[in-house]
């Protein structure tokens, strides 16, 4: 079968550099789980290196042309190709509560959505690695006090240790994207349970950063906090001045306030 044609509406940019594909596959430590799910494998440049490892590899691909290509060229993937949209698919139809890692050269147009979707399965995902638009990868790994630090940074780092590994040039893709890419690795924290309400924590973080230039006293007005609580010194700060632990402590204070 001929090579798959990259489809713009799917955000496809096929990696052609074998050494980079191998490096991405090697970011997984493969401990504590027996299954790996690759999102958006395309023509399998990364897949071949995953299949060589001592884990069971599944792939999920929305592009039917790519699915046909994988089926014809990778016999080891027999019964392990999921022709679905990752953002809508119930992963436990295949993993049934088991632990698995996620990896991929993620489509730029939905990469952030992929991360948020993966967070929903964090109890089953001890490790997550792959390639994003460089700016997105940096945002995920960013620490407090910078413009890039935001919702994605806090919510991911509440549950995972995030590490930016290396930058990838535009020229190693077909077609080349307009921006550089970045590879990162997330490893789930040993204790990743939140000592506060999860739903409220997500709400506090998202609400705070929606008006990131304002102090928390102003950005969190919609939560209807008591006047006494709003006098706490933390409300003089802007959201990018709080690290993950401080957001957790803030959420606990809001809980105690009766929210």
Swiss-Prot record:
Q: Where does S-adenosyl-L-methionine bind?
A: 13, 15, 40, 61, 85, 105
Major location category of this protein: cytoplasm
- Write down the SUPFAM superfamilies for this protein, in alphabetical order: S-adenosyl-L-methionine-dependent methyltransferases
Report which reactions are catalysed by this protein. adenosine(1518)/adenosine(1519) in 16S rRNA + 4 S-adenosyl-L-methionine = N(6)-dimethyladenosine(1518)/N(6)-dimethyladenosine(1519) in 16S rRNA + 4 S-adenosyl-L-homocysteine + 4 H(+)
State whether keyword Cytoplasm applies: yes
Matches recorded under InterPro entries: KsgA/Erm, rRNA_Ade_diMease-like_C, rRNA_Ade_methylase_Trfase_N, rRNA_adenine_dimethylase, SAM-dependent_MTases_sf
For the protein in the UniProt heading, the enzyme class is: transferase
Q: Where in the cell is it found?
A: Cytoplasm
Q: Which UniProt keywords apply?
A: Cytoplasm, Methyltransferase, RNA-binding, rRNA processing, S-adenosyl-L-methionine, Transferase
Q: One GO molecular-function annotation for this sequence?
A: RNA binding
EC number(s) in its UniProt entry? Answer: 2.1.1.182
Q: One of this protein's Pfam families, by short name?
A: RrnaAD
Q: Which GO terms describe its cellular component?
A: cytosol
Family, similarity comment: Belongs to the class I-like SAM-binding methyltransferase superfamily. rRNA adenine N(6)-methyltransferase family. RsmA subfamily.
Its function? Specifically dimethylates two adjacent adenosines (A1518 and A1519) in the loop of a conserved hairpin near the 3'-end of 16S rRNA in the 30S particle. May play a critical role in biogenesis of 30S subunits.
Q: What is this protein called?
A: Ribosomal RNA small subunit methyltransferase A
Q: Which organism is it from?
A: Flavobacterium psychrophilum (strain ATCC 49511 / DSM 21280 / CIP 103535 / JIP02/86)
Please name the gene that encodes this protein. rsmA
């Amino acid at each position: 079968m001929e090579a798959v044609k990259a489809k713009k509406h799917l955000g496809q940019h096929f990696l052609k550099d074998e050494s980079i594909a191998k490096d991405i596959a090697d970011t997984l430590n493969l401990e504590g789980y027996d299954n790996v799910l690759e999102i958006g494998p395309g023509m399998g440049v990364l897949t071949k290196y995953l299949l060589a490892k001592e884990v069971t590899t599944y792939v999920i691909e929305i592009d039917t042309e790519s699915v046909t290509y994988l089926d014809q060229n990778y016999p080891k993937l027999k019964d392990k190709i999921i022709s679905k949209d990752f953002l809508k698919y119930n992963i436990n139809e295949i993993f049934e509560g088991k632990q698995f890692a996620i990896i991929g050269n993620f489509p730029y147009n939905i990469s952030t959505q992929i991360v948020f979707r993966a967070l929903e399965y964090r109890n089953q995902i001890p490790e997550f690695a792959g390639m994003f638009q460089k700016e997105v990868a940096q945002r995920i790994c960013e620490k407090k006090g910078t413009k890039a630090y935001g919702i994605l940074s806090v919510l991911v780092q509440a549950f995972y240790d995030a590490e930016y590994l290396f930058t990838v040039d535009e020229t190693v893709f077909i077609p080349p994207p307009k921006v550089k890419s970045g590879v990162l690795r997330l490893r789930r924290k040993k204790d990743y349970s939140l000592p506060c309400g999860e739903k409220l924590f997500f709400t506090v973080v998202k609400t705070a950063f929606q008006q990131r230039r304002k102090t928390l006293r102003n950005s969190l007005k919609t939560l209807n906090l008591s006047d006494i609580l709003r006098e706490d010194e933390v409300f003089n700060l802007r959201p990018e001045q709080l690290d993950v632990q401080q957001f957790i402590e803030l959420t606990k204070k809001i809980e105690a306030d009766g929210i």
